[in-house]
């Protein structure tokens, strides 16, 4: 193998392993966040049974669905997240060669910053094209509040993908894709762009104390998450439309979804579950730091 191929493989492995570990750890927070986001678009959750907030959700889930239900959809998330994060990190470095080739970060700061934004955004958008159906399935499985058996909308990952494909075709698995691309570019641009720029401005980036790296990563994930959160809420709502027919369809399209959420629920609705997203972001920050640490030994 060439040095470039070895480097690509190391990026793929280091990024994927770090992501799988952290995602499993924060899966309960992830499910709470998703339920708060999509409950208004769920056929299973009637108005009188909607969750009032994070704590209400945390208390009711184990009582109504069992403790293990906190990890509902986690398998799809791990399967999805491994290639997503690994491809993001791997492609990010490839895109950096394109956007940052010959750029001096000390004398051309803004060009360096813009290049990092572009490479991070392009990496995220490229990866999304490959793994979106898994992201879709993860959302629908996590939003399934049935206790067991017939009460469940889907029996598992395979059942979800098959049922939606039968009812809506492959297109159904890509519901909300356009707004997802918009959101992922914004999120990844900040996630990678600001982090790499901040680390690049340190005197000795490769030997930075892990606490400093974590603090930078934590700030980056919080800002990136909040900035792109409304896009995430809209895409999750659109995902809930697949499999519906006639009067059951709540939104005719992405723009209609934006309008109805703002009109019927208010602007705050775009940020439902955002606080749990910040907590979940600690896992994202851990991924960035762990990725850097793993690369030191590979």
Curated annotation (Swiss-Prot):
Positions of post-translational N-acetylmethionine modification: 1
PTM-bearing positions, type N6-succinyllysine: 43, 105, 147, 155, 268
Residues modified to N6-malonyllysine: 23, 92, 96, 147
Subcellular location: Mitochondrion inner membrane; Membrane
Entry-linked SUPFAM superfamilies: Mitochondrial carrier
Residues modified as Phosphoserine: 7
Mitochondrial intermembrane side, ranges: 1-7, 100-109, 200-210, 292-298
Membrane protein topology class: Multi-pass membrane protein
N6,N6,N6-trimethyllysine sites (modified residues): 52
Family note: Belongs to the mitochondrial carrier (TC 2.A.29) family.
Biological role: ADP:ATP antiporter that mediates import of ADP into the mitochondrial matrix for ATP synthesis, and export of ATP out to fuel the cell. Cycles between the cytoplasmic-open state (c-state) and the matrix-open state (m-state): operates by the alternating access mechanism with a single substrate-binding site intermittently exposed to either the cytosolic (c-state) or matrix (m-state) side of the inner mitochondrial membrane. In addition to its ADP:ATP antiporter activity, also involved in mitochondrial uncoupling and mitochondrial permeability transition pore (mPTP) activity.
PANTHER family xrefs: ADP,ATP CARRIER PROTEIN 1-RELATED-RELATED, ADP_ATP TRANSLOCASE 2
Domains as described in the record: The transmembrane helices are not perpendicular to the plane of the membrane, but cross the membrane at an angle. Odd-numbered transmembrane helices exhibit a sharp kink, due to the presence of a conserved proline residue.
Descriptive protein name: ADP/ATP translocase 2
Lineage, broadest ranks: Eukaryota, Metazoa, Chordata, Craniata, Vertebrata
């Amino acid at each position: 193998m060439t040095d470039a191929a070895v480097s690509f493989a190391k990026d793929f492995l280091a990024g994927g392993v770090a992501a799988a570990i952290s995602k499993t750890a924060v899966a309960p927070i992830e499910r709470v966040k998703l339920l708060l986001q999509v409950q208004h678009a769920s056929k299973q959750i009637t108005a009188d049974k909607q969750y009032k907030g994070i704590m209400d959700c945390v208390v009711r889930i184990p009582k109504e669905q069992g403790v293990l239900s906190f990890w509902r959809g986690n398998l799809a998330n791990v399967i999805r997240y491994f290639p997503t994060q690994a491809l993001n990190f791997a492609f990010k470095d490839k895109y950096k060669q394109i956007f940052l080739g010959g750029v001096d970060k000390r004398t051309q700061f803004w060009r360096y910053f813009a290049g990092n934004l572009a490479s991070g955004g392009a990496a995220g958008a490229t990866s999304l094209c490959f793994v979106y159906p898994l992201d879709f399935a993860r959302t629908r499985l996590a939003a399934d509040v049935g206790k067991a058996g017939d009460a469940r909308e889907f029996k598992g990952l395979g059942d979800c993908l098959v049922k939606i494909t039968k009812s809506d075709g492959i297109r159904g698995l890509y519901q909300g894709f356009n707004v997802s691309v918009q959101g992922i570019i914004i999120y990844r641009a900040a996630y990678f762009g600001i982090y790499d720029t901040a680390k690049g401005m340190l005197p000795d980036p490769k030997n930075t104390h892990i606490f400093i790296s974590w603090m930078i990563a934590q700030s980056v994930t919080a800002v990136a998450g909040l900035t792109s959160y409304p896009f995430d809420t809209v895409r999750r709502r659109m995902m809930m439309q697949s499999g519906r027919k006639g009067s059951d369809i709540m939104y005719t399209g992405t723009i209609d979804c934006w309008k109805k959420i703002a009109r019927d629920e208010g602007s705050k609705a775009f940020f439902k579950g955002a606080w749990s997203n910040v907590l979940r972001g600690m896992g994202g920050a851990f991924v960035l730091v762990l990725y850097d640490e793993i690369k030191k030994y590979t």
